[in-house]
Amino acid sequence: MYVMSQTTNTEDTIDLKELFFSLIAQWKLIALCIILSLICALLYLRATPDTYSVNALVQVEENKGASAALLGDLSSMIEQKQPAQAEIEILKSRLVLGNVIQHLNLDLKISGTENSFTDRLLSPHHYQTEYQPKSVLFKDDEKVFDIRQFNIPASFRDKKIELRFKDGQFSLTNTQTEQVILTGKTNQSNTLRTADGLWNISIYTQDQLNDVYLIQKQSLPAAVNNILTNYSVAEKGKLTGILGLNYQGTDKTHITQVLNAILVSYSQQNIERRSAETAQTLKFLDEQLPELKQQLDVAEREFNKFRQQYNTVDVTKESELFLTQSVTLETQKAQLEQQVAEAGAKYTSEHPVMKQMNAQLGAINKKIGELNATLKELPDLQRRYLQLYREVEVKQQLYTALLNSYQQLRIAKAGEIGNVRIVDTAVEPIEPIAPKKLQILILSIFLGGFLGTLLALLRNMMRSGIKDSTQIENELDLPVYATVPRSPVQESRINILKKKKNIPILAVKNSDDIAIESLRSMRTAIHFALSSARNNLITISGPAPEVGKSFISTNLATILAQSDKRVLIIDADLRRGYLHKYFNLDTQPGLTELLNGQQSLETVIRHTEVPGLSVISRGKSPANPSELLSSNQFKNLLEQMSEKFDHVIIDTPPVLAVTDGIIISQYTGVNLVIARYAKTQMKELELTLNRFEQAGVKVNGFILNDIQRSSAGYGYGYGYNYAYAYKANKESD
């Protein structure tokens, strides 16, 4: 159990290491994604205007209306405290925002026609709109025009209209029908009546304007909604009565101006509402005081008349007590009736406050009835005296109370300030709140790195080819003669080399390259394979194109020639062979011309700059390459070359594409198959072996080509590191 667990952990570690190295191998892809992500972020920051935010604070104080002067102690019962949510809705209402829109002409929207994301990215135009109480000023870089009147028919509200300037005139064009609505002169008032309605427009400018602009007169609901998209109100804390106002926009001066205008409008409507309540109460008192004064005068005349007629009346202590109680009850009744009349203007009879006040009034009437019944038992003269005296006292106290309330309300109206207090006004911001440039750049780096890593992983998953030589040896039971790493020199010049007519031989130009060192290590294995082979002919084949057959063939032939061997390399890929590019030769004369009898053997065998190395190019592409390669002429050619040279290397076409490689391998002693790292599939190698077996040909082994350094496993990585360390020491020597 322990051994199995340890093996599993080791395999997992190797897998993670291979994954890590595969990402390092694709660092260019990841870096490219990061760069592209940064470029996109920079373009976004260039095209996105800065967004600013302004704030203000409002305190909503306890609401004590003018009716409190009349209701007295009952005002605490009648008064309804307005929650913060009610004031928030008022701050968002058309009542408040409509005044701001009308005052600053915020219902007029002007923009350039080049205002899309792409236009802002490429166009140098800088547009700015300044809203003023009497006009709207629009700036296009250094050019300015001022709209002082723009009254249009209702049918054109909320519609974009093209505004064009030319030769001191302007024209308005319907963007939907592209028809000119009207034409007017600048720097004067223009009035025109059309079938749609009356137009009254005044545009002033001192500049020569030749551009086209879009102008829109919004309806009140649309203008309010336009403000509400960037405007918010919320209570600070819970039940604090402090409201926080926030407004955002791209023009910091404009948003500060708008938010302060909202504060002024809200404060004014609050004062006007409270003043209206006070005025309503004063109007009620103006109606009640003269009538009450008249009633008091009548009561006093009756009482004085009674006293003159009967001089003085002996009133007992008991009668005085009844009189005091009666006056108190009648005064309370009169005051309560006044309160009921005042509250009746605000509440229905079913309101709890009205029900409670009516219940109190009923209780007082009941007590007055009981007291009147007691007073009837007194002597007639005393009873009449008490009634008249009570009437005078009640009217006097009630009149005095209402007169005091009236004077207090007049003073309150003169100093009315409302129940809201502006704690903080809007102050022009300094720094924008968006876009957050540093965060966006950092995020773009992480996003680019993530996308690059994801693409690298997907690319690695798609590259499901052979990545380990042991996989070939275990599944196909054949040796891998060499694992050839990707040459750093070849990798850096691969795109250039494909386009050139001449491809340099790596074994000549960079003889100490790690790929060449791997091929040198294969010489011993080839020597043992040839010792038991029927001849010295070696075929280099592969299952598919672009596995590196020509690269391996050329450099292997060069290495063998450098060890004082006579080597011939034949380009048997008569369709697409390009061995001639390695030796800076023409394709003709070549193998095709030799087999067709058009050229002699001495003519097609050409010597190269590498001592001991000769080459036969493919020649002109024939119509029947398979027939030529299966002919006796080709067989005889190979037999002659086998005797003349120490090694004959034949570069063949892909086995799975055409049968040429199988035909050639029937004549050779050693057959090697090239597999490309992470590209060649195991299934391709199995099919290739089946093709050879069907033809009765033995495959000696494989060469795993183009192993990438950073994505190699432990064994490959060790070989790489050793080669690089050895090369570095050599250079230092």
UniProtKB/Swiss-Prot annotation:
Sorted alphabetically, the Gene Ontology cellular component annotations on this record are: plasma membrane
Among InterPro entries, the record links this protein to:
AAA_dom (IPR025669), Bact_polysacc_biosynth/exp (IPR050445), GNVR (IPR032807), LPS_length_determ_N_term (IPR003856), P-loop_NTPase (IPR027417), Wzc-like_C (IPR005702)
Its localization reads: Cell inner membrane
What reaction does this catalyse?
L-tyrosyl-[protein] + ATP = O-phospho-L-tyrosyl-[protein] + ADP + H(+)
UniProt topology in membrane: Multi-pass membrane protein
Q: List membrane-spanning regions.
A: 19-39, 438-458
Name the Pfam families on file: AAA_31 (PF13614), GNVR (PF13807), Wzz (PF02706)
Kinase found in the keyword field: yes
Q: Does the keyword ATP-binding apply?
A: yes
Task: Report the cofactors.
Answer: Mg(2+); Mn(2+)
Query: Which GO molecular function terms does the record list?
Result: ATP binding; protein tyrosine kinase activity
Q: List the residue ranges forming a coiled coil, or say none.
A: none
For this chain, the family text in UniProt reads: Belongs to the etk/wzc family.
Its name, as the record gives it, is Tyrosine-protein kinase ptk
Gene coding for it: ptk
